[in-house]
Amino acid sequence: MPCYHKLKAWQLCSGEVVFAERGAIARELELPCGQCIGCRLKRSLSWTIRNVHESQVHPLSMFVTLTYGDDGYNPSLVYRDFQLFMKRLRRSVGPCRFFAVGEYGESDELNRYVRTFSGLDTTSRRPHFHALIYGQYFSDRAQIGSVDGKPLWRSPRLEALWKHGHSSFGDVTFQSAAYCSRYCCDKVNGERALDHYKRVDVATGELVDVVPEMAHMSLRPAIGVPWLARYGADIVCARDGVVLNGKTYALPRFYDRVVESLVPDLHSDKEFDRYILSEKFAADLTPERMAAREIVAKARISTLQRKL
């Protein structure tokens, strides 16, 4: 996905990048804004690819959903609750890696889900966590339903570990990884965030601030690095991209940085090849075409329903 609102910048002879013309300028740059729908979708896709690759190096993995019940209900996400859940999980089943996001239910999709499988009466944008857990799986599972044809399970062991409400789990797939990664598209920044992250506390009637959507993950090593160490050199040399679900995607930017640090000459060659290839698509990068593509991207993302 391209950036639809690139920022003009300048690189000084010292190597510093500035956003106002000053000093000894070496060259002019166009940098991604990081906030438009194109940048958010690109970041989301990168996390999806890295999480799918992470799952491929573990024999066991699961997609866990943790919601809050009505007892002691807090309208805001509390990351400490998830941290303690992970500590209990590791004490119970052993080492594991994870990629977790905390977010708030969109429209009534989460509310319908919670009412269906837990019986809770929900009327607000309920905070919840999704986590891709690598290296462990609950064998005491019992099916409680399905989402998009994929079975959804409950587990007494999982319920004992998450003490704040309803819990369930399914399999890690491209779709579930993408579902987690789309938190990038939900987070609101800037002036809009002041009103967006306010909720009414149903217990007191007060207007309270809630924390924004968040993501936390295993860092040592980073998500996707075990896969990259095993297959990365062959993939980069062969096609400069990755294939998932029969479709070829560009390498995540993080993979590029790792390859650059390990094999700088190979990275330089690939960068030059990409520059030459980009010349073929120059006609599709005019301001008019970019404006049209942004409209299409926003329309496409609006059709993606969140069902968990």
What does each model-identified segment do?
Residues 31-34, 58-63, 95-96, 164, ...:
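Sequence-level motif detector for i,i+2 pairs with an aromatic at +2
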Residues 42-123:
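Signature for HUH/AEP ssDNA processing cores
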